[in-house]
């Protein structure tokens, strides 16, 4: 496999896409299945340490994992020659591979939007990065939590669509 070949770049970006996706969805599931249910059990005087030290670091990797995943996913689809067909869900092409990967891409795009434009702005209020009143912080906590739960639910069909394409056939 030549370094300049499309096959090499397809492999490289697909691998980065998988690693980034693990980083993103791993953090998503950590927040929803570990941190959120555990926070009420943490003594009140220790909670600020979690919000000040652990949460910002975890959110950094969560946010940028989402960005790397969507960018490398688009690159993989472009190099693989199925970007446009996947975006239109393979409609009119009778191509189940592009339909499945397209649904996965659209679900991933919705999740990415939630991370960058709903979860993170609200988490910044919770962490005190953005000025907010106590009522705004409570509302931001609820909105970020709801968007995070939506992403957790969307991650299951998204992962199914992304993985199942390998069994349907195609790149």
What are these regions (language model features)?
Residues 1-171:
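Polytopic transmembrane helical bundles with strong interfacial aromatic enrichment
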């Amino acid at each position: 496999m030549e370094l300049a070949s499309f096959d090499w770049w397809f492999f490289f970006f697909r691998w980065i896409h998988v690693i980034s996706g693990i980083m993103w969805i791993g953090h998503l599931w950590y927040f929803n299945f570990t941190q959120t249910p555990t926070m009420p059990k943490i003594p009140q005087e220790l909670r600020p340490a979690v919000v000040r030290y652990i949460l910002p670091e975890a959110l950094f990797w969560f946010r940028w994992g989402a960005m790397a995943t969507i960018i490398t996913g688009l690159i993989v689809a472009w190099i693989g020659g199925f970007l446009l067909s996947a975006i239109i869900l393979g409609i009119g092409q009778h191509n189940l591979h592009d339909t499945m990967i397209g649904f996965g891409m659209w679900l991933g795009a919705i999740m990415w939007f939630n991370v960058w434009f709903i979860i993170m702005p609200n988490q910044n209020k919770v962490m005190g990065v953005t000025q907010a009143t106590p009522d705004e912080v409570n509302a931001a906590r609820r909105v970020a939590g709801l968007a995070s739960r939506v992403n957790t639910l969307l991650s299951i069909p998204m992962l199914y669509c992304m993985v199942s394409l390998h069994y349907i056939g195609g790149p």
